[in-house]
Protein backbone atom coordinates (compact mmCIF):
# COMPACT_ATOMS: atom_id res chain seq x y z
CA UNK A 1 0.00 0.00 0.00
CA UNK A 2 1.51 3.30 -1.05
CA UNK A 3 1.51 6.45 1.04
CA UNK A 4 -0.82 8.03 -1.51
CA UNK A 5 -3.34 5.22 -1.13
CA UNK A 6 -3.16 5.53 2.66
CA UNK A 7 -3.69 9.28 2.47
CA UNK A 8 -6.62 8.80 0.12
CA UNK A 9 -8.13 6.21 2.44
CA UNK A 10 -7.73 8.46 5.49
CA UNK A 11 -9.05 11.43 3.57
CA UNK A 12 -12.12 9.51 2.42
CA UNK A 13 -12.81 8.14 5.90
CA UNK A 14 -12.59 11.59 7.44
CA UNK A 15 -14.59 13.25 4.71
CA UNK A 16 -18.29 12.81 4.35
CA UNK A 17 -17.97 13.26 0.59
CA UNK A 18 -17.59 17.02 0.87
CA UNK A 19 -20.82 17.29 2.84
CA UNK A 20 -21.00 20.33 5.07
CA UNK A 21 -21.32 20.25 8.83
CA UNK A 22 -24.58 21.94 9.79
CA UNK A 23 -24.26 23.98 12.97
CA UNK A 24 -27.42 25.04 14.79
CA UNK A 25 -27.32 27.96 17.20
CA UNK A 26 -29.07 27.40 20.53
CA UNK A 27 -30.64 30.63 21.87
CA UNK A 28 -33.36 32.00 19.60
CA UNK A 29 -33.25 28.92 17.36
CA UNK A 30 -33.81 25.90 19.64
CA UNK A 31 -34.09 27.50 23.09
CA UNK A 32 -36.36 30.45 23.89
CA UNK A 33 -34.00 32.97 25.52
CA UNK A 34 -36.64 35.69 25.80
CA UNK A 35 -39.14 33.16 27.13
CA UNK A 36 -36.58 32.45 29.86
CA UNK A 37 -36.26 36.17 30.62
CA UNK A 38 -40.07 36.49 30.82
CA UNK A 39 -40.23 33.54 33.20
CA UNK A 40 -37.45 35.00 35.37
CA UNK A 41 -39.20 38.39 35.66
CA UNK A 42 -42.74 36.98 35.81
CA UNK A 43 -44.02 38.99 32.83
CA UNK A 44 -46.17 38.01 29.84
CA UNK A 45 -43.83 39.55 27.27
CA UNK A 46 -40.24 40.75 27.66
CA UNK A 47 -41.13 44.10 26.05
CA UNK A 48 -43.01 44.91 29.28
CA UNK A 49 -39.55 45.23 30.84
CA UNK A 50 -38.45 47.95 28.41
CA UNK A 51 -40.88 50.60 29.67
CA UNK A 52 -38.42 51.91 32.30
CA UNK A 53 -35.97 53.87 30.14
CA UNK A 54 -33.77 54.67 33.16
CA UNK A 55 -32.57 51.05 33.23
CA UNK A 56 -30.09 49.35 30.96
CA UNK A 57 -32.20 46.21 30.55
CA UNK A 58 -29.56 44.22 28.65
CA UNK A 59 -26.97 44.84 31.38
CA UNK A 60 -29.50 44.10 34.11
CA UNK A 61 -30.51 40.78 32.53
CA UNK A 62 -26.87 39.77 31.96
CA UNK A 63 -25.99 40.66 35.57
CA UNK A 64 -28.98 38.69 36.82
CA UNK A 65 -28.24 35.51 34.83
CA UNK A 66 -24.44 35.54 35.28
CA UNK A 67 -23.32 32.71 37.55
CA UNK A 68 -26.74 31.00 37.48
CA UNK A 69 -28.27 27.96 35.76
CA UNK A 70 -30.43 30.26 33.58
CA UNK A 71 -29.47 28.59 30.28
CA UNK A 72 -30.44 25.14 31.58
CA UNK A 73 -33.96 26.41 32.37
CA UNK A 74 -34.88 27.90 28.99
CA UNK A 75 -38.10 26.76 27.35
CA UNK A 76 -37.66 24.76 24.14
CA UNK A 77 -39.26 26.06 20.94
CA UNK A 78 -41.99 23.78 19.59
CA UNK A 79 -40.21 23.70 16.23
CA UNK A 80 -36.86 22.47 17.65
CA UNK A 81 -37.41 18.75 17.02
CA UNK A 82 -38.60 19.30 13.47
CA UNK A 83 -35.67 21.63 12.75
CA UNK A 84 -33.17 19.00 13.94
CA UNK A 85 -34.93 16.31 11.86
CA UNK A 86 -34.77 18.54 8.79
CA UNK A 87 -31.03 19.08 9.27
CA UNK A 88 -30.39 15.37 9.84
CA UNK A 89 -32.30 14.51 6.69
CA UNK A 90 -30.10 16.97 4.78
CA UNK A 91 -26.79 15.68 6.21
CA UNK A 92 -27.58 11.99 6.38
CA UNK A 93 -28.07 11.90 10.15
CA UNK A 94 -25.72 14.48 11.65
CA UNK A 95 -26.09 17.87 13.31
CA UNK A 96 -23.90 20.02 15.55
CA UNK A 97 -24.52 22.90 17.95
CA UNK A 98 -22.52 26.13 17.72
CA UNK A 99 -23.53 28.56 20.47
CA UNK A 100 -21.96 31.62 22.07
CA UNK A 101 -21.14 31.74 25.78
CA UNK A 102 -22.35 34.60 27.95
CA UNK A 103 -19.59 37.20 28.00
CA UNK A 104 -17.90 37.26 31.39
CA UNK A 105 -19.50 33.93 32.37
CA UNK A 106 -17.97 31.62 29.77
CA UNK A 107 -17.45 28.41 31.75
CA UNK A 108 -20.66 28.60 33.74
CA UNK A 109 -22.91 29.47 30.79
CA UNK A 110 -21.25 26.75 28.65
CA UNK A 111 -21.92 24.18 31.39
CA UNK A 112 -25.62 25.05 31.61
CA UNK A 113 -26.07 25.30 27.83
CA UNK A 114 -24.67 21.76 27.57
CA UNK A 115 -27.06 20.65 30.32
CA UNK A 116 -29.97 22.19 28.39
CA UNK A 117 -28.91 20.27 25.27
CA UNK A 118 -28.65 17.03 27.28
CA UNK A 119 -32.12 17.51 28.81
CA UNK A 120 -34.07 18.89 25.84
CA UNK A 121 -32.88 17.55 22.49
CA UNK A 122 -31.25 14.46 21.03
CA UNK A 123 -27.50 14.54 21.40
CA UNK A 124 -25.63 16.37 18.64
CA UNK A 125 -22.44 15.06 17.03
CA UNK A 126 -20.57 18.06 18.38
CA UNK A 127 -21.25 20.91 20.81
CA UNK A 128 -19.17 24.04 20.29
CA UNK A 129 -19.40 26.96 22.70
CA UNK A 130 -17.43 29.86 21.24
CA UNK A 131 -17.54 33.60 20.79
CA UNK A 132 -15.95 33.08 17.36
CA UNK A 133 -18.45 30.91 15.54
CA UNK A 134 -17.03 31.93 12.17
CA UNK A 135 -13.84 29.94 12.79
CA UNK A 136 -15.98 26.86 11.93
CA UNK A 137 -17.33 28.34 8.66
CA UNK A 138 -15.27 26.03 6.45
CA UNK A 139 -14.04 22.48 6.80
CA UNK A 140 -10.30 22.82 7.56
CA UNK A 141 -9.27 19.82 5.45
CA UNK A 142 -11.53 20.10 2.40
CA UNK A 143 -12.49 23.77 2.32
CA UNK A 144 -16.17 22.76 2.11
CA UNK A 145 -18.35 25.64 3.31
CA UNK A 146 -20.23 24.63 6.46
CA UNK A 147 -23.74 25.83 7.30
CA UNK A 148 -24.81 27.93 10.30
CA UNK A 149 -28.46 28.34 11.28
CA UNK A 150 -28.54 31.37 13.60
CA UNK A 151 -30.96 34.08 14.72
CA UNK A 152 -28.44 36.95 14.78
CA UNK A 153 -27.64 38.77 11.53
CA UNK A 154 -24.15 39.69 12.79
CA UNK A 155 -23.28 35.99 13.30
CA UNK A 156 -24.52 35.14 9.80
CA UNK A 157 -22.51 38.04 8.29
CA UNK A 158 -19.29 36.93 10.05
CA UNK A 159 -19.93 33.32 9.04
CA UNK A 160 -20.41 34.26 5.39
CA UNK A 161 -17.38 36.57 5.57
CA UNK A 162 -15.29 33.54 6.61
CA UNK A 163 -16.53 31.50 3.63
CA UNK A 164 -19.45 29.67 5.22
CA UNK A 165 -23.11 29.44 4.24
CA UNK A 166 -25.54 31.12 6.64
CA UNK A 167 -29.27 30.71 7.19
CA UNK A 168 -30.86 33.47 9.27
CA UNK A 169 -33.69 31.92 11.29
CA UNK A 170 -35.56 33.13 14.39
CA UNK A 171 -37.81 30.40 15.79
CA UNK A 172 -40.34 32.84 17.24
CA UNK A 173 -40.72 34.67 13.93
CA UNK A 174 -39.76 32.52 10.95
CA UNK A 175 -41.30 29.42 9.43
CA UNK A 176 -39.18 26.28 9.11
CA UNK A 177 -39.69 26.67 5.36
CA UNK A 178 -36.99 29.34 5.54
CA UNK A 179 -34.50 26.71 6.78
CA UNK A 180 -35.73 24.13 4.26
CA UNK A 181 -35.24 26.60 1.41
CA UNK A 182 -31.81 27.61 2.76
CA UNK A 183 -30.66 23.98 2.82
CA UNK A 184 -32.02 23.37 -0.68
CA UNK A 185 -30.29 26.52 -1.95
CA UNK A 186 -26.98 25.36 -0.44
CA UNK A 187 -27.18 22.25 -2.62
CA UNK A 188 -27.78 24.40 -5.71
CA UNK A 189 -24.91 26.78 -4.88
CA UNK A 190 -22.52 23.84 -4.42
CA UNK A 191 -23.60 22.20 -7.70
CA UNK A 192 -23.14 25.44 -9.63
CA UNK A 193 -19.52 25.87 -8.55
Residue ranges and their predicted role:
Residues 71-76, 80-113, 117:
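Substrate-recognition element of Asp-dependent hydrolases with the DxDx(T/V) motif
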Residues 137-142, 179-190:
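Short amphipathic alpha-helix with an adjacent loop that forms part of the alpha/beta core around
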Amino acid sequence: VTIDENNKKLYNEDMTDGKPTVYIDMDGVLADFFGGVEKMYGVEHWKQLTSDKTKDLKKEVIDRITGTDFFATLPIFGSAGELISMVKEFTGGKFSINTSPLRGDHENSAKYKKLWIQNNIEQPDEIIVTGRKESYAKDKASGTPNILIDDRPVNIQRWQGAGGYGILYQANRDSLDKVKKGLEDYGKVQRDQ
